Amino acid sequence: MKTSLLAAVCLAASFSSVASGQGGQGKGGRGPAQTWWVNKTGGGVYKPPNRPLWKLAELKQMHAGQNTWQEQIILDPEQDATYNSGAPGKKYTARMHPDTPTVFVVVAGEVHFNAEGQEPATATRGAIVNLMKATVFSYEVTSDQNALWVEVNPTNYKTVYPSAGPPPAASTDGTVVKVAFNHNPAAYTPPNRFMFNTFTDAIAACKGGVVAVQDDHLFASPLLGYVNPAENKCGNGTGNIGSGPAKPDDPPFNSHSVFGHIHAGPAEWWIVQVGQISGKFENTGEFHAVEGDVLYAAPMTWHQMAAEAPSGPNVRLAMGGYQLINMQNTENPGRGRGDQ
């Protein structure tokens, strides 16, 4: 596909959640989606550390012999994300991000959080911890195994530490100085809350696709689907399985074709919270992920997601800097219609 191509795309007719944004023939009698022109640059451009797939198993191999480690997995114009492991008993001292919020997504183990203005709480597998800007917080690993989590911040965030505690180590190009200012933790406004757990608040509560985080350059929504609709006790069929598992008569996937949808500018990415998820990415290929893995669609990339685990729930936690519009392709409208 040529870069800088004026491509026709479909814009979802309503500014609904990531889980419900659809292109093409609208549901509930909405009629056809509106069509628009957008200037599309070449997709599948990944600048390190960004990559289509970060596999948890490979991260563990990279840090073999280490219990506590941190790996930068995403750094783009909107977000800065690290994958983290903490040994049992590891403590992280009080700190604050004065101008920006922070999200922790716990993959395994237990992490106990103390956040200003909130009751102390322990985050376990499936937890999404949402810390408002200007909130002093500390945390520690309380499980008897290593805890794993993804920390997500807006790009160019800064951290300060209360002067009552020890100063942090200086960067190679900086000096730690004492500053003075007053702070007030930002208030939670719906849908934001201190802690959300995908297993209890989405799967058990039949609220797949609910927006868990929507703040400045931070968005998170667990997309829940069942390949076998008989296992879905919520009674809404397969839910959000995207394009679903591959079928025997499917043609070979061509990453240089037009399929699925794009987003006009920002990247979209996903943390697999349970089940198996595949991602097809323009000019890049097809990737298969399991719980704890991270998939990333680079900006302006045609992409198509699918739930693959034949049994049980499949959840991909949709992440990004914004609540993105799904701009469906019009060249092959039957390929990836309604996937997220």
Language-model region placement:
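Short beta-strand His + acidic residue motifs that chelate non-heme Fe in jelly-roll/DSBH
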Residues: 93-94, 113-114, 131, 136-144, ...
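Short acidic-glycine-tyrosine-enriched beta hairpin
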Residues: 117-134, 283-299
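A short, N-terminal "cap"/entry segment at the start of jelly-roll beta-barrel domains
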Residues: 23-80, 93-94, 160-247, 252, ...
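Bacterial N-terminal signal peptides that target proteins for export
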Residues: 1-6
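A short hydrophobic beta-strand segment most commonly corresponding to one strand
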Residues: 130, 144-161, 296, 311-330
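Bacterial N-terminal signal peptides
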Residues: 7-14
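Boundary at the C-terminal end of the N-terminal hydrophobic targeting segment
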Residues: 19-21
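Short, conserved beta-strand element in jelly-roll/cupin
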Residues: 85-86, 96-113, 243, 262-279
